[in-house]
Amino acid sequence: MNKNDSRLRRARQTRLKIAELSVARLAVHRTNLHIYAQVFSEDGTKVLASASTAEAEVRKELNGNGGNTAAATLVGKRIAEKAKAAGIEAVAFDRSGFRYHGRVKALADAAREAGLKF
């Protein structure tokens, strides 16, 4: 079992536990160049809000560098604003098997500061 398989196994277990809660899910995906955040509906079938460093407005603001904690903070603020605009106040945080550290933590903290509850 390699590093990615272990991460996917952890992510699967987390998603099963979140599904039992029947609450909207804030999922985070991290790559070397970008960070992505999506808010899924309670049943997990619809994306209610999304934000990433690949968006044109975000790239312009970051001058093309989307792989750092400053970029993750900006994405966290944007996802919280979009989720609140869609009527979502509380979510369950799905870190997709990534460690709660660095960019993932920066995104979560920024989303909390912007008013999203989890």
Swiss-Prot record:
One Gene Ontology cellular component term attached to this UniProt record is: cytosolic large ribosomal subunit
Coiled-coil spans are: none
Task: Give the disulfide map.
Answer: none
Per UniProt, which keywords does this protein have? Answer: Ribonucleoprotein, Ribosomal protein, RNA-binding, rRNA-binding
Which SUPFAM superfamilies is this protein grouped with?
A: Translational machinery components
Q: Does the keyword Iron-sulfur apply?
A: no
GO biological process terms held by the UniProt record = translation
The GO terms this record gives for MF are: 5S rRNA binding; structural constituent of ribosome
Q: What does this protein do?
A: This is one of the proteins that bind and probably mediate the attachment of the 5S RNA into the large ribosomal subunit, where it forms part of the central protuberance.
Q: How does it assemble?
A: Part of the 50S ribosomal subunit; part of the 5S rRNA/L5/L18/L25 subcomplex. Contacts the 5S and 23S rRNAs.
Family to which this protein belongs: Belongs to the universal ribosomal protein uL18 family.
NCBIfam families, per the entry: L18_bact (TIGR00060)
Instruction: Give the protein's recorded name.
Output: Large ribosomal subunit protein uL18
The gene designation is: rplR
